Amino acid sequence: LAQSFPASDRTWAISLTASQVIYAGGGVRSSVKSSTLVRDAAELDLKAAINDALLGVRTAFYGVLLSREKITVQEKNLDLLQQQLKNVTDRFNAGTVSSFEKLRGEVAVANAKVPLITARNDYRLAIETLRQALGFTTNKQESLRKIPDFIGTLDYAPVSFELQSAFTAAQVNRPELQRLAKLTSAREESVTAAKSGAKPTVSAFGGWQLRKGGTNSFSDSNDGWLVGVQSQWAIFDGRATAGRVSQARSVLEQTKLTLTEAQLAAEVEVRRAFSQWQQATELADASKLVTGQAEESVRLANARYNAGTGTQLDVLSAQVDLTTARTNQLQAYYAYNVAVASLRKAMGQADEFVTN
């Protein structure tokens, strides 16, 4: 017995093929390395942005501490002037001083209230600056007028730095320089990848194929395996490969120039930060000594005035000098702490809060 199947006007085929590049003139490997280096460069760029943000937050926090301490200085100044006014008023009532001295004391007290009001407003503004640096926002009604409490004081803790060591640390640790070094290596790999266009490529392939015949019988089909090696080589491409190589080399040279420029900028930043640190150190040491002398001057002026050998002008002048000395000391401590943080950042060191 025989069975026949009618002819069909449809044929179909299934083909599964896999290939693997064996040799591509180093292009594939260079492309993978280049992509990895670019990814690493992006991570270093993020690290640099984080360092900048942390420095901004630390500087803003020091600004809050400075503004808060200035309020204390102005409050102490006002308290001393009020005590002096009370002393003058008592003497005026006793008839030992003129109304002029009493009036002068009242004017001094009134004038002392102005910088206190300014200091309190500066404190509120410093908090807003810190809030912006932190990216902190709140729409709660109860928090709009609330002033947060800040822990810490504006202290002077001497730290030693050496200029040559700072240069070395900056060249090694700065994420901006590391990023450009990664990009330079990536551009070198891009040149290698571009050169691979002038070299042959060799690939191994294998596959399986099923082809259906021209009848409705499923047995009317053929299938089989295929394994082989193939090669391609663009002998002439209108100098397209040469153009890509030239372009890749141009980008490489631009990246190298950018790296050199960044290294010079980092060196200048280290020098500037180191100079500011030196200045801040000298000012902090000097202001500490002057404040002690100004406090002693106020004590002696009050003693001489109470003994009748000094004048009210001596007391007021000494008090002004003390307030100026205390303010300068706070400003010097603030400048020193900011200078240390800026120098650490210029050297590529992470913020102390991160390292600790």
Regions found by a protein language model. Give the residues of each.
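Small/polar (Gly/Ser/Thr/Ala-rich) solvent-exposed segments
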Residues: 2-9, 19-48, 178, 197-225, ...
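Bacterial Sec-pathway N-terminal export signals of envelope proteins
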Residues: 11, 17, 21-22, 150-184, ...
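Transmembrane beta-barrel architecture of outer-membrane proteins
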Residues: 11-13, 59, 104, 224-226, ...
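Residues on the lipid-exposed face of transmembrane beta-strands in outer-membrane beta-barrel proteins
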Residues: 16-20, 130, 229-233, 332
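Periplasmic alpha-helical coiled-coil/stalk elements that build and connect Gram-negative outer-membrane
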Residues: 49-169, 273-276, 280, 322
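Amphipathic alpha-helical coiled-coil segments
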Residues: 49-75, 83-85, 90, 126, ...
